[in-house]
Amino acid sequence: MRLQHRHFRFRLRQPLHTAAGVLEERRGWLLRLEDDNGHLGWGEVAPLAADQLALCSVQLERLQQASSRQQLEEALSGSPAALAFGLGAALAELDGLVGSPAQPWGQAPPPAWLLPSGERMCA
């Protein structure tokens, strides 16, 4: 099992007003999880609270050492919610719960290739 992550950051076209304050940008990570058979699972970690960014960053670095699914699953319960969601989504895709052959993921639209991750992340 191999976990990769890539940081993203972009300004919102319009500020987003929430009960916790105003968001002018989104920051987070794209997760790419690959099993030993080459199957992929994708997730996104984008905490709304700024203080959660540092926690997610530290936890993601620790998860780089995880070499088994069991280690990743054990990390879910102690992780910040945004990280647990992103990792859970990647694991669910590996399990065929989303993006199954009966209902495959569509190809990324051309503008998505302009994201900082580019072809290297999607290949």
Features from the language model and the residues they span:
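N-terminal capping/lid subdomain adjacent to the active-site entrance of alpha/beta enzymes
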Residues: 1-123
